[in-house]
Amino acid sequence: MAEAPQVVEIDPDFEPLPRPRSCTWPLPRPEFSQSNSATSSPAPSGGAAANPDGAAGLPSASAAAVNADFMSNLSLLEESGDFQQAPGSVAAAAPLSQHPPVPPAAAAAAAGGQLAGQPRKSSSSRRNAWGNLSYADLITKAIESSAEKRLTLSQIYEWMVKSVPYFKDKGDSNSSAGWKNSIRHNLSLHSKFIRVQNEGTGKSSWWMLNPEGGKSGKSPRRRAASMDNNSKFAKSRGRAAKKKASLQSGQEGAGDSPGSQFSKWPASPGSHSNDDFDNWSTFRPRTSSNASTISGRLSPIMTEQDDLGDGDVHSMVYPPSAAKMASTLPSLSEISNPENMENLLDNLNLLSSPTSLTVSTQSSPGTMMQQTPCYSFAPPNTSLNSPTPNYQKYTYGQSSMSPLPQMPMQTLQDNKSSYGGMSQYCAPGLLKELLTSDSPPHNDIMTPVDPGVAQANSRVLGQSVLMGPNSVMPAYGGQASHNKMMTPSSHTHPGHAQSTSAVNGRALPHAVNTMPHTSGMNRLAPVKTALQVPLAHPMQMSALGGYSSVSSCNGYGRMGVLHQEKLPSDLDGMFIERLDCDMESIIRNDLMDGDTLDFNFDNVLPNQSFPHSVKTTTHSWVSG
C-alpha cells in the first residue's frame, strides 16, 4: 500500500505552485540567482534550468526550477528529484489517512520556508530596491556628477529619475512623494551635505558635499539654533568665562573695584560657581539696586513698632476686657479711683437741667467695660469735680503716628461758658442718634468730624491742658463749612484730650465734649459738645494732647483773650499756663510736610451713654 501513492498524481491545479513575490519587497531580481539563468523571470529560468537535466515534463518541474534559483551549491537534479517525489507521497497519503490538509500543509511550509528564507538571506546584501546604494550614496553621486559639484534639490530629483532605473517611472507627483521626502531627509540628516545660499533671488539653495568630509553615517540630528547648540552662544559663553577669570584675577589686585563688591555678595550672581551665571558677570546684578530687599527699606508705609505685642496692637481700638485695658493703660486704676468717682457724684448733683448729661459711674476698672467697647478715665494730674470723661460716642479712626507737636481741638459754643472736658472714645453710634433726634435744634450739638491725623512712634497717654483766663488758645486745622463764629466772651476750662497711641500705624480720632456751665449758679446750661478739628495734614504731636479751644471762622489762627471769670474754688490752686505759638510757622513746617489722608467713619449709636436725646443743628453735617 505504500507503493500505490507513487502511481497517483495530483491534479496540476492543486499542486503547490510558487507565487511570484510581487506582494513583498524587494522583488526578486535575476542577479540574486546563482544559477546559470540569464532571464529576468523566475519561471522561465527555472524551466531552462530543468530541461537540460532530462527531467521529462513533470508537474513539479516549474516549482523545482524556482527553488533552484534561490539555492546555492546544490544540484538542480537533486532538488528536482526530491521535489518530484514529495507530491507523490502527499497524494498517496491523502486517500489513506483521511487527513489530506496536514501533509500538504507541512510540504507547503517546507517549500515556503525555502522560498521565503532564502531570498531574505540573500537580500541582506541588497539594501534597497534599486541596489546596494543608499539615498546618501545616490545623492553623493548626483552632486559629484555635476560640473560645479553642486545641485539644487530639484536637480537632485531630476538626476534620480534619469540615472536610477528604479525611479524612472516614479517621477510623477503621486509616486515621487515618498522618495523625494527621503532625499530631503537624508540631505538634512547627514553632515556630509551642506547647503549654500544661492546668490540669485528666489532660487533654492545649493547642496554641496562637505569639503571637510562630514560623517556619511547617521549623526545626531541638526536642530534649530538655540542657546545649547548654536556656535555663537558657545563662543559667547567662552568669552564670558574668560572675562570672568580676568575679572577675578583683577579683583585680587584691586579689591575695591565694582566687580569685586558684586562677586563678594552671597546673593550676587558672580559668587556662584555655576556656569549658567557666567553671562551675568557682565551685567549689573539686581542685588546692587537700592530697591532690592538686601538694601534699606524704601516702602512709604511705616513699619510697625517692634515694642508692640500682639495684645497691644488693637487693645485701644478693640479692648477685649477690663484686665486687658488695664494692661494697655497702666494708669487706669489710678484715674478711676474712688475719689474721682465721688467727685463725679458730687458734680452730677449740679446737673439740674432736664437736658443734663448723665454719666455712668464705675467704681473699679473691672466694671468699666460696658456693652460697647468703651472706657472712661480722667487724667491723673487733675483734681476737678467734673465728671469723669466717658470715652464714648466716637469710633477710632486709623492712621500712622509719629511724635508731633500738638493735637488741636475746637469747641463750638453759643455765648455760654464751658466747663470741664469730656473726651469720648467709643465704637458705634452717633450717626443714628443724630438722625433720630426729635428735639429742637440748637439746644445740644454733637457734631463728629474727621479725625486728627497724627503720627507718633510711641504711645502717649492723654494729658490735660488747663486753660484759664487770659490764655490765648491756638487752633488750627480745617472744619466743616458750617462752622460757627465763636464769641470771644466765652472761655474754656480744662479741655481733656488724649493723644493717640501708635497702633499698627493707625490714628485715633479725638472728640471733645464740653459741659458748659454758668459760674456762681447751681444749674448748668444745656450740654454743649465740643469736637475735634479735622486735620488736613499729618501733625506732629508732642507729649501734650489736643487743646480744647475756641475756633475762628477760618479754622485756624490766634484766638482773642478769653472771657475772664473766676474759676471754681477747686480750680484756684491749679497751675495755669499761657499757651502761645506761631501758627504760620506751624502751618508751613508741620502741616505742609505731610500728605493728605482720607478717612471713613462709621458712627453707630452705643448702648450706654447720654440717655437724653441729642439734638442736631439746622444745617446737619450728616449726608443723606
Swiss-Prot record:
Biased composition (Low complexity): 37-62, 105-119
A GO CC term attached to the entry: cytoplasm
Region DNA-binding, residue ranges: 181-188, 204-207
A biological-process GO annotation: positive regulation of protein catabolic process
InterPro entries listed in its UniProt record: FH_FOXO1, Fork_head_dom, FOXO-TAD, FOXO_KIX-bd, TF_fork_head_CS_2, WH-like_DNA-bd_sf, WH_DNA-bd_sf
Chain spans, region Sufficient for interaction with NLK: 253-532
Region entry Required for interaction with RUNX2, spans: 333-428
N6-acetyllysine modified-residue sites: K215, K218, K232, K235, K244, K393
Omega-N-methylarginine: residues bearing it: R221, R223
Site (DNA-binding): N128, Y135, R195
Example of a GO MF term: DNA-binding transcription activator activity, RNA polymerase II-specific
Residues carrying Phosphothreonine: T24, T303
Residues spanned by motif Nuclear localization signal: 221-223
Posttranslational mods: Phosphorylation by NLK promotes nuclear export and inhibits the transcriptional activity. In response to growth factors, phosphorylation on Thr-24, Ser-226 and Ser-292 by PKB/AKT1 promotes nuclear export and inactivation of transactivational activity. Phosphorylation on Thr-24 is required for binding 14-3-3 proteins. Phosphorylation of Ser-226 decreases DNA-binding activity and promotes the phosphorylation of Thr-24 and Ser-289, permitting phosphorylation of Ser-292 and Ser-295, probably by CDK1, leading to nuclear exclusion and loss of function.
First-listed, main subcellular location of the protein, grouped into a coarse class: cytoplasm
DNA-binding region of this protein: 130-224
Subcellular location: Cytoplasm; Nucleus
Top-level taxon of origin: Eukaryota
Matching PANTHER family: FORKHEAD BOX PROTEIN O, FORKHEAD BOX PROTEIN O1
General function of this protein: Transcription factor that is the main target of insulin signaling and regulates metabolic homeostasis in response to oxidative stress. Binds to the insulin response element (IRE) with consensus sequence 5'-TT[G/A]TTTTG-3' and the related Daf-16 family binding element (DBE) with consensus sequence 5'-TT[G/A]TTTAC-3'. Activity suppressed by insulin. Main regulator of redox balance and osteoblast numbers and controls bone mass. Orchestrates the endocrine function of the skeleton in regulating glucose metabolism.
Assembly and interaction partners: Interacts with LRPPRC. Interacts with RUNX2; the interaction inhibits RUNX2 transcriptional activity and mediates the IGF1/insulin-dependent BGLAP expression in osteoblasts Interacts with PPP2R1A; the interaction regulates the dephosphorylation of FOXO1 at Thr-24 and Ser-263 leading to its nuclear import. Interacts with NLK. Interacts with SIRT1; the interaction results in the deacetylation of FOXO1 leading to activation of FOXO1-mediated transcription of genes involved in DNA repair and stress resistance. Binds to CDK1.
Name of protein: Forkhead box protein O1
Organism: Bos taurus (Bovine)
